[in-house]
Design a protein with these regions (language model features):
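Aromatic-lined carbohydrate-binding/catalytic grooves of carbohydrate-active enzymes
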Residues: 1-144
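Conserved, mostly hydrophobic/aromatic
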Residues: 2, 55, 171, 266, ...
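Aromatic-lined carbohydrate-recognition surfaces of secreted/lumenal glycan-active proteins
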Residues: 3, 60-75, 159-180
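Glycan-recognition surfaces
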Residues: 103-108, 115, 163-276
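Carbohydrate-binding surface patches
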Residues: 258, 264-267, 272-274, 310-350, ...
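Catalytic cores of secreted or luminal carbohydrate-active enzymes
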Residues: 259-308
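Solvent-exposed beta-hairpin/edge-strand motifs
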Residues: 347-362
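C-terminal beta-strand-rich structural cap/linker in extracellular carbohydrate-active enzymes
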Residues: 368-388
């Protein structure tokens, strides 16, 4: 999937700062459309159709980011809702707003609201959209007490709109942290949902993900994938207003990058690259294209935390998963210094049998082992192995 992120409808956007209460590109039904000055192929009402067609011609799929609700601009102009007797003002929930973006009002659970969501997904289907990242919806940061959980009814409306639009679309809900007590409702209505707030290249955030993955490990199943968020690798900022002219590459050390990739992979989180791909170095590219890693990510089942022993957040974490005629294990060192990790193979396999072990990141066979395997692991690093 190639996904176009937030505010593709904002003609004055220049960097990662939002222009509050700015004019947005919108059609006569209050539906946001690509800014023509930034996406010239959208002129004449074409939307993202030409871009989607090109991406499809490469054998890839196309996605867009949306905010829940209806543009405030549409409410101020009181645009009609397509195929409905209602208008934008009838369906807007003026107190349901995003705390970090001024573009939208949420929708009431009322007549006309479903019609509006139907109309925008009808439009997205005509463009050839395959993936929707809907933001300010898995959990909101304003008036969370208004509904059983944030945007509960809007999630259901979006699900119905996708089901009725005539095109299959993956639905991803952001931001987190989604609540585990809402797992059944999320699984019924979405394919992905964020377990955390925005994830960036800081060790504390990465370490916290062990807790999140443990909490959600039993909710991973075909069609439902709790989401660890994007992979902040490679060149992360090009037009940031607050990181200087050179902006920056990931701040994660190489061992920390290995830890992140190993945890996301064995947990079966969706994998979305958050850097600027044309500027990838060989190291970053090797993380994204490791065939054995991608095979593990596709094929594993029943991934779970097998062992964790830490003091003040420093120690050892081990995750295991079933593969096809094999097992996988990820050995994580959360200490600030290199450490040896001993893994008892006999706890997940038949004791006293010999098993071959393949190091996925090193790309080599490590030999045959019976009952135990020991690895020396870098500080904040990981060893990811296939056992067969």
């Amino acid at each position: 999937y190639v996904a176009c992120d937030i505010q593709w409808y904002e003609p004055k956007a220049k960097d990662n700062d939002y222009n509050n209460f700015t004019e947005l590109d919108m059609d006569e039904y209050g539906r946001l459309i690509p800014a023509e000055n930034r996406f010239p192929s959208s002129k004449g009402g074409k939307g993202f159709k030409e871009i989607a067609d090109y991406i499809h011609s490469l054998g890839l799929k196309f996605g867009i980011h949306i905010m829940r609700g209806i543009p405030r601009q549409a409410v101020h102009k009181n645009t009609p809702v397509k195929n409905s007797k209602f208008t934008a003002r009838d369906i807007a929930h003026h107190f349901s707003v995003c705390s970090w973006n001024t573009d939208m009002y949420g929708l009431k659970n009322c007549e006309g609201a479903q019609d509006y969501y139907n109309s925008i997904f009808e439009l997205y289907a005509s463009w050839g959209v395959d993936f929707i990242k809907c933001d300010d919806i898995a959990v909101t940061e304003f008036r969370q007490w208004d509904t059983p959980y944030s945007a509960y009814y809007e999630i259901e409306m979006i699900r119905k709109a996708i089901d009725n639009c005539g095109r299959d679309m993956i639905l991803s809900l952001s931001p987190g942290p989604a609540k585990i007590e809402n797992a059944k409702h999320l699984a019924k209505n979405a394919n992905m949902w964020r377990m955390t707030g925005d994830f960036w290249d800081m060790w504390d955030k990465l370490h916290d993900m062990f807790d999140k993955c443990y909490t959600w490990q039993n909710e991973v199943k075909p069609g439902n994938y709790p989401d660890c968020d994007m992979l902040p690798l490679g060149r992360l900022c090009k037009h940031s207003s607050y990181h200087g002219p050179n902006n920056r590459y990931t701040q994660f050390t190489k061992p920390e990058q290995i830890t992140m990739m190993s945890l996301w992979g064995i947990f079966k989180s969706p994998l979305f690259f958050g850097g600027n791909m044309p500027e990838n170095d060989e190291w970053t590219l090797s993380l994204l294209t490791n065939r054995e890693y991608l095979k593990m990510h596709r094929e594993t089942t029943k991934a779970h935390q097998h062992y964790r022993s830490e003091k003040n957040g420093k120690g050892t974490v081990i995750w295991v998963a079933n593969g096809k005629k094999c097992k996988y294990a990820a050995l994580f060192n959360t200490k600030d210094a290199k450490s040896k990790i001993k893994f008892n193979l006999s706890e997940i396999l038949m004791p006293d049998e010999k098993y071959k072990i393949y190091d996925i990141w090193a790309g080599k066979e490590l030999g045959e082992y019976r009952n135990t395997f020991t690895a020396e692991v870098e500080a904040h690093g990981a060893v990811l192995i296939k056992i067969y």
